């Protein structure tokens, strides 16, 4: 019987049904749901195949597994498509969903399709509008005018987390600062909790936890009051290094600090107002841009010395962190040092290490003994810090303070294809929340994308409405939610969409047991989801603090790049052809698959040529899931050959015994059976610890063992057991061929519903162990002895083995390391 993967996959997919009652669920497996861009790519294949292996394995372990899928369907690309192709975002999105759903099904993923939804469904976003109203009620949402990150290409505001190295996370455009009225969620209310609870996430990658820890950015320090000279005003400065106060030579404030209202030099005011604030985006960009400052002309009095400190306006100070003002000790802070060098400011050393340091070259940031610091002289840095705080508090000019780098989440976006914010503005009543009974507020369909600016604000009628409080003419909020709002709670929506969130089901199913996705979402989606759990718990929707128990972050799928002599990217097939023709082509390193680099491998082409099982097996072979994997055509061909061999080996074996009995077998046959169960045990352990590539290597080894057993005509009962084990353990990886082979060998029911094979523990017990015999610590020989041998018998064997080395010497002592070594200590005879 020939292996026709297209017939096999089509036949099997028609028979699968993974419907489960959520009230019976014992295990919740979820992958980060896709944006419906139009096609499933290889990164999706890896993500979803990993999740599917876990889901299928857990079902085989006897658990009722919940494995849903949905669509993260709002977003700017749909608007861009509407403009480019003259098609509505709704139509474009639904068409893409239909295509991608078909692709996902062709991969053979064991999804609960009956739970499918898209976040652009009004039934879905109705509930997040309800959440927002409750966030308002509980003080977790508010509106204010603030400096925001403006993406000039996408024409919308971005949250701090969406600005990467000063550029928009999607467009790559350099971000500008603008002042706009925006809606915010108070994620900072949970900053301490979000940070502290990272310790409880034992099954999250340490790298992700570290990224969140740094993003939340707890700083414990003090606020010190500095009196402004000539003005009845105090400047509050935050510092984590109060012990360096005696080394302060200037103060730096943000370009937006309110103290600057006291600057009365017209030219200085113009310089400050005209400063390009695009460099003041986040700490990462501040650390890379050249230090720049303006002497404001204002002066602060040092609180402990009879000196005045000039106040500079500096581009390395952010108004939204701390107090927007810092005192600067150039000798012991590199950033302050660079600034002081540029503007010829004093550098006063107050920390002295054992060896001399050259403060002409760089700041000294290590530990040492305090000096030139009055009452702190001779103290260690830690003691000096405590003493300085006590002194300043006693003077009434200092208080302890904790700040977080984390800022509240700005959720207003000036786009059409998103969830409308349920707010009405009335000239008489002000800000009026929409009544819950009037939800959902839906999007208009007759939208014009040719005009610049906010499409909803440009709509001729949609924004006009009546005030629900007084009945007067009013206007709707025309901004929509940041699309991360939708993805921050979808895992809970699967537990009860259609009636909102089912509290009992959520409390039972959440947190998600296994969550799979890219590490690039560490401080966006993953952090927002943790916040949402806490916010929804505060509002009474459920009682869940963390969204995901176990997090698995997969690496990227990479492919070689090809460039012509002009540096233009080539499609791989064109590059290879040109190389064969002797033309100049540069083969670049393997990079993440990207349309712009023309190194994308299309999933449909692979499935059509090799089949879904080949694609699944390749994407899980060779490389641990957390590492990047390189796509190689020869490897997918090798996987395809293996599947054909597997099929032929099992189909051609004509002595298969369904009711196999493996008793009373020869010792040689027993060794084969022991090996089979050892491999089964290894595969099971590999799956428990997500070592999918190791599990693949092991079941391919098992295939080779079975092939050898068949060639040597080993007992057909033992061979049959091994074949049944092999078919079952490959099913999570290559479910189509496994399901079909199960039918061929007479398996009962559907393979996907069968339990995982049990390892016979007796077969894993070592009958013999190798013991190293030593004399005075030197190797003599390794001997095989029974595992349960007693010490006296072992000593007798060792003495016999070492007799020639012992000779006429006296045995002084014999030491035994159980299961490993026996060492005979001898002394020469006198």
Curated annotation (Swiss-Prot):
One of its GO terms (molecular function) is ATP binding. CDD domains: Anticodon_Ia_Leu_BEm, LeuRS_core. Pfam families: Anticodon_1, tRNA-synt_1, tRNA-synt_1_2, tRNA-synt_1g. A motif ('HIGH' region) lies at residues 34-44. Keywords: Aminoacyl-tRNA synthetase, ATP-binding, Cytoplasm, Ligase, Nucleotide-binding, Protein biosynthesis. Coiled coil: none annotated. GO terms for biological process: leucyl-tRNA aminoacylation. It is found in: Cytoplasm. GO terms for cellular component: cytosol. ATP binds at residue 595. A motif ('KMSKS' region) lies at residues 592-596. Its main location: cytoplasm. It is an enzyme of class 6 (ligase). It catalyses: tRNA(Leu) + L-leucine + ATP = L-leucyl-tRNA(Leu) + AMP + diphosphate. Its EC number is 6.1.1.4. The keyword Ribosomal protein does not apply. NCBIfam families: leuS_bact (TIGR00396). Belongs to the class-I aminoacyl-tRNA synthetase family. This is Leucine--tRNA ligase. It comes from Ehrlichia ruminantium (strain Welgevonden). The gene is leuS.
């Amino acid at each position: 019987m020939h292996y026709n993967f297209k017939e096999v996959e089509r036949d099997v997919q028609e028979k699968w049904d993974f419907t489960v009652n959520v009230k019976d669920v014992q295990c919740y497996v979820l992958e980060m749901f896709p944006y419906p861009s139009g096609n499933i790519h290889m990164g999706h294949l890896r993500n979803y195949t990993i999740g599917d292996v876990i889901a299928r394995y857990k079902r085989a372990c006897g658990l009722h597994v919940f494995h849903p899928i949905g669509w993260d369907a709002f977003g700017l690309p749909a608007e861009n498509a509407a403009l480019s192709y003259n098609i509505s975002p709704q139509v474009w999105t639904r068409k893409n969903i239909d295509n991608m759903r078909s692709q996902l099904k062709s991969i053979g993923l064991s999804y609960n399709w009956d739970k499918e939804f898209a976040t652009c469904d009004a039934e879905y976003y109705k509930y997040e509008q309800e959440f927002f109203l409750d966030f308002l009620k509980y003080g977790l949402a508010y509106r204010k005018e603030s400096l925001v990150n403006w993406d000039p290409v996408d024409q919308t505001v971005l949250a701090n987390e969406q600005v990467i190295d000063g550029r928009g996370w999607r467009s790559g455009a350099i971000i500008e600062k603008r002042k706009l009225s925006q809606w915010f969620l108070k994620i900072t209310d949970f900053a301490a909790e979000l940070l502290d609870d990272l310790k409880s996430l034992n099954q999250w990658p340490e790298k992700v936890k570290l990224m969140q820890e740094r993003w939340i950015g707890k700083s414990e320090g003090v606020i010190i009051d500095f009196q402004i000279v000539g003005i009845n005003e105090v400047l509050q400065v935050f510092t984590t290094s109060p012990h360096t106060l005696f080394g302060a030579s200037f103060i730096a404030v943000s370009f937006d600090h309110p103290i600057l209202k006291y600057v009365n030099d017209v030219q200085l005011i113009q310089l400050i107002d005209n400063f390009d604030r695009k460099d003041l985006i986040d700490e990462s960009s501040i650390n890379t841009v050249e230090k720049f400052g303006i002497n404001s002309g204002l002066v602060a009095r040092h609180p402990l010395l009879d000196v005045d400190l000039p106040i500079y306006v500096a581009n390395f100070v952010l108004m939204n962190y701390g107090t927007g003002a810092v005192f600067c000790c150039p000798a012991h802070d590199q950033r302050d040092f660079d600034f002081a060098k540029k503007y010829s400011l004093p550098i006063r050393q107050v920390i002295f290490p054992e060896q001399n340091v050259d403060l002409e070259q760089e700041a000294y940031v290590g530990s040492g003994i305090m000096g030139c610091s009055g009452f702190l002289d001779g103290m260690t840095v830690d003691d000096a810090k405590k003493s300085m705080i006590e002194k300043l508090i006693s003077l009434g000019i200092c208080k302890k303070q904790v700040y977080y780098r984390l800022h509240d989440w700005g959720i207003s976006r000036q786009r059409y294809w998103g969830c409308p914010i349920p707010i009405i503005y009335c000239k008489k009543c002000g800000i009026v929340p929409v009544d819950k009974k009037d939800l959902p507020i839906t999007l208009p369909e007759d939208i014009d994308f040719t005009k610049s600016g906010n499409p909803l604000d440009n709509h001729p009628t949609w924004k006009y409405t009546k005030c629900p409080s007084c009945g007067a003419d009013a206007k709707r909020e025309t901004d929509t939610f940041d699309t991360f709002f939708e993805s921050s709670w979808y895992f809970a929506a699967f537990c009860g969409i259609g009636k909102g969130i089912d509290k009992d089901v959520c409390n039972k199913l959440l947190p998600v047991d296994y969550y799979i996705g890219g590490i690039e979402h560490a401080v966006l989606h993953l952090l927002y989801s943790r916040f949402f759990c806490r916010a929804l718990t505060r509002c009474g929707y459920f009682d869940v603090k963390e969204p995901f128990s176990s997090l698995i972050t997969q690496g990227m799928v990479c492919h070689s790049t090809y460039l012509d002599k002009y540096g233009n990217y080539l499609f791989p097939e064109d590059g290879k052809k040109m190389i064969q023709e002797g033309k100049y082509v540069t083969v670049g390193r393997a990079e993440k698959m990207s349309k712009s680099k023309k190194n994308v491998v299309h999933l449909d082409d692979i499935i059509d040529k090799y089949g879904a099982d080949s694609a699944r097996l390749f994407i899980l072979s060779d490389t641990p899931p957390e590492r990047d994997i390189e796509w190689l055509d020869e490897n997918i061909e090798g996987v395809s050959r293996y599947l054909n061999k597997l099929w032929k080996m099992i189909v051609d074996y004509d002595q298969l015994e369904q009711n196999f009995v493996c008793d009373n077998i020869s010792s040689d046959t027993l060794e084969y059976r022991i090996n089979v169960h050892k491999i089964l045990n290894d595969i099971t352990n590999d799956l428990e610890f997500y070592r999918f590539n190791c599990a693949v290597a092991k079941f391919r080894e098992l295939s080779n063992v079975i092939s050898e057993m068949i060639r040597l005509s080993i007992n057909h009962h033992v061979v049959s057991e091994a074949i049944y084990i092999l078919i079952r353990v490959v099913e999570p990886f290559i479910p189509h061929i496994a399901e079909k082979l199960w039918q061929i060998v007479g398996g009962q029911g559907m393979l996907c519903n069968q339990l995982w094979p049990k390892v016979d523990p007796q077969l894993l017990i070592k009958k013999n162990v190798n013991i190293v015999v030593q004399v005075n610590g030197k190797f003599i020989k390794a001997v095989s002895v029974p595992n349960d041998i007693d010490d006296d018998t072992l000593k007798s064997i060792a003495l016999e083995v070492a007799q020639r080395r012992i000779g006429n010497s006296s045995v002084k002592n014999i030491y035994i390391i159980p299961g490993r070594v026996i060492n005979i200590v001898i002394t020469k005879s006198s």
